[in-house]
Each structure stands twice: as C-alpha cells, then as structure tokens.
Amino acid sequence: MDAFKGGMSLERLPEGLRPPPPPPHDMGPSFHLARTADPREPLENSASESSDADLPDKERGGEAKVPEDGGAGSAGCGSAEDPAKKKKQRRQRTHFTSQQLQELEATFQRNRYPDMSMREEIAVWTNLTEPRVRVWFKNRRAKWRKRERNQQLDLCKGGYVPQFSGLVQPYEDVYAAAGYSYNNWAAKSLAPAPLSTKSFTFFNSMSPLSSQSMFSAPSSISSMTMPSSMGPGSVPGMPNSGLNNINNLTGSSLNSAMSPGACPYGTPASPYSVYRDTCNSSLASLRLKSKQHSSFGYGGLQGPASGLNACQYNS
C-alpha cells in the first residue's frame, strides 16, 4: 500500500518536482528481462520464417501431389489399359471348317515341315492367316510324334516281350523244375541220392539192348578179330579143344558178368551200365588174351584170380 501511495503521489506531483529517473545500473533487471525477451523474438521470427519457409514446401508438396494424382490417374489409365492389353494378348480359339481341315491334313501328309511360302499359299487356299497355319502345323506335328511314340511302346509291350518271356524263366521256376529248393540243401548233403536215381539224358536215351549190342559176345569178338579164312582149327600150333575151352570159359564169364543178378549195382537200365559194360569187355578181352597166351605155352600156369568174374574184379 505504501508503494502504491508513493506511486500515486509521484504521479500527482508536477513534472518539475518529480525526482529524476533512477541510474542506468538499476535498470539491469529490466534490460535483462528485455534481453531475455529479445532472444525469443528471433525464435518467433525463426518459427515464422520456418512456417514461411514451409509454405513453399507445402506448395511443393501440393505440386508434388499433383504428379501423384497424375500418377494415380496414369495408374488408373494403366489399370484401365491392362485389361485391354490382356484382351489383346489373349488368343481367340480358331474353329476350322471341315474343308480347311481336309486341306491342311492333305498338305500335312505330303509335307510335315512346310516353309514360309507354302504356308502362305495354304493360308490363301483356306482363308486363314499364316500364323494360324504355322501354329496348326506345329500342333499337328506334336500330335503325330506322340502317336508314333505310343505305337512303338505298344509294339514293345505286345510283340517282343511275350516272345522272350517264354524263353526266359524265373529262377524259382527253374529250381522248382529241377527239383531243388532252398531248404533241403542240408538234407541232400547228409543223405546223398543213390546212383540209380540220378538222371542223365544221354545215357537214359540209350536202351540196355543198344548198350549190350555195342559190346558183343566173345564168339562174335573172336570172329571179328580173326579173319574169315581162319577157323578154330586153322591156328597153327593150337588144338581145337583149347579154343573150344577158351570160348566156353570166356562166354560163361561174360554172360555171368553181363547178367543182372551177378552184379549188386542195379538193373542194366541204370545209366552206369555202359561204364560197367566197358569194364567187363576190357576185362574179358584181357582174360581172353591171357588164355590165348596160356594155351600157346603156359597152360600149366594159371593165375589165382582167373576164376573171378567181372563184378568181383570191380569190388
């Protein structure tokens, strides 16, 4: 209140009686406030300048937006043009008439790869364009190659495979036909099959009569080995009785050797009868030669095994 009253009294005083203003150093706070307020002005000015400077940017942004709008408009035009382009790029299906197809097929049978001039001629004949004719020939060649490939596959499946399938048998069928199995190897190794049960096609095809006819009786052997002009008594230095004894001995021994009951190996129809016949014939010929030698000068000497038959020799 005192300060307010003092202020009021100073204002009521005339100008001449008013006290002088305070010294400048007392105005520091006011100047300081003014100084503090001064830096704000540039800030405000800078803000205004920045806002003013932003205006061209905004204008530029607006100007930039115009191309964006224009770009959007162009994009819209492009989007509007895309379906048109798609419609242009989309191929329309060509429907050929029967006359056109006949002409094209006839030309394809003559030439599968027509050149440009020939395609143009075909296009003129069929009232088609050259690209249509070219595409038709391309598709027709692809269809023809596919048909040829399928025919070759059918021939391979239907013709050649059955011919070879009859010749080649699976492994299981071969083993089954031969009588083998995968589980009886141990049984076969422990219990071998007898000789008479084995099958040999070559020897089984030979009958016992043919095997016996191969090796004839001693009389026939003696007649074959001796000339026809030489009879039993024509041998010099050898009596007829000695030759008769030789024939009797060799005939009895050979008959006993070739008889089925004399040998315990099996019937003459067995595949090993040929081998036994060869052994018997060789032994019989050896005994015949020994008898002949003994009759010529060694009649008193006779081996201990001269009375044995062929089977006893084999044993």
Swiss-Prot record:
User: Per the record, where are the segments of Basic residues compositional bias?
Assistant: 85-94
- Indicate the principal place this protein occupies in or around the cell: nucleus
Q: Where is this motif: Nuclear localization signal?
A: 287-291
- Coiled-coil residues are none
Bias class Basic and acidic residues marks the residues at 55-68
Q: What Pfam families has UniProt attached to this entry?
A: Homeodomain, OAR
Q: Which residues carry this modification: N-acetylmethionine?
A: 1
Per the record, which residues fall in region Disordered? 1-103
Q: How does it assemble?
A: Interacts with POU1F1.
Please identify the protein, giving its name as recorded.
Pituitary homeobox 1
Organism of provenance: Rattus norvegicus (Rat)
As recorded in Swiss-Prot or TrEMBL, the protein's gene is named Pitx1
